[in-house]
Amino acid sequence: MSLTPLCEDLPQFLQNYLPNAGQTENTIVPFVTLTYAQSLDARVSRGPGVRTTISHPETKTMTHYLRHHHDGILVGSGTVLADNPGLNCKWGPDPAANSPRPIIIDTKQKWRFDGSKMQELFIKRQGKPPIVVVTSEPIIKEQHVDYAICPINDTTKLVDWKKLFEILKEEFNIRSVMVEGGANVINQLLLRSDIVNSLIITIGSTFLGSSGTEVSPPQTVNLKDMSWWKGITDVVLCARLADD
């Protein structure tokens, strides 16, 4: 499916929130962009595991423009199990070459590359094979898949995000990562101003209701350096997380 042309004013609007090589050369972690689409009532889907369209086609094109500017694209296993996404880039003169490397958080090792949309696109040379994040040696090692073994944080009992991003840069040369979801991943990283460099949120013109899957971090999060863009039906907020 072809993309709607990118709105002419979006590149300039996004410019200050995109990865810059100079910003990551002397750091041990990649440039991290946290980006997602939500409804007016802060829902990212109609319910757990329910694939939901929120964005207008023009902001879907923006998503692929963002993918073009990142080395990796990270999602949780719940998202890939529910949506079976391709996670490739369809924007630009050579989208396949500029597609980000999919990075899948799969600590329970439920997801398989074999038979997935990602594998289909990889075979067609329209996408790249994934890096799967696990907490111990994988039970099954699939062909073309790389594995990042990342410890659990002793305090939170969740993925050690700082260590993971260090591994992605050091072992896989991932210098910029676009985090797309799902809600659990987003809620965790909204609290990490020490890791997240940019926040880009598309807000669709819809309410998804109280049964929807909500983005709501467990504590107050303040933003800074905010900019707004208005489209046909969506608005886009670009910002940075304020320090605690």
UniProtKB/Swiss-Prot annotation:
Keywords: NADP, Oxidoreductase, Riboflavin biosynthesis. NADP(+) binds at residues 79, 83, 159, 182-186. The keyword Oxidoreductase applies. It catalyses: 2,5-diamino-6-(1-D-ribitylamino)pyrimidin-4(3H)-one 5'-phosphate + NADP(+) = 2,5-diamino-6-(1-D-ribosylamino)pyrimidin-4(3H)-one 5'-phosphate + NADPH + H(+); 2,5-diamino-6-(1-D-ribitylamino)pyrimidin-4(3H)-one 5'-phosphate + NAD(+) = 2,5-diamino-6-(1-D-ribosylamino)pyrimidin-4(3H)-one 5'-phosphate + NADH + H(+). Disruption phenotype: Cells lacking this gene accumulate a 6-hydroxy-2,4,5-triaminopyrimidine derivative. GO terms for molecular function: 5-amino-6-(5-phosphoribosylamino)uracil reductase activity; NADP binding. Pathway: Cofactor biosynthesis; riboflavin biosynthesis. Its EC number is 1.1.1.302. InterPro entries: DHFR-like_dom_sf, RibD_C, RibDG_C, Riboflavin_Biosynth_HTPR. Pfam families: RibD_C (PF01872). GO terms for biological process: riboflavin biosynthetic process. Catalyzes an early step in riboflavin biosynthesis, the NADPH-dependent reduction of the ribose side chain of 2,5-diamino-6-ribosylamino-4(3H)-pyrimidinone 5'-phosphate, yielding 2,5-diamino-6-ribitylamino-4(3H)-pyrimidinone 5'-phosphate. NCBIfam families: ribD_Cterm (TIGR00227). Homodimer. Belongs to the HTP reductase family. This is 2,5-diamino-6-ribosylamino-4(3H)-pyrimidinone 5'-phosphate reductase. The lineage of its organism: Eukaryota, Fungi, Dikarya, Ascomycota, Saccharomycotina.
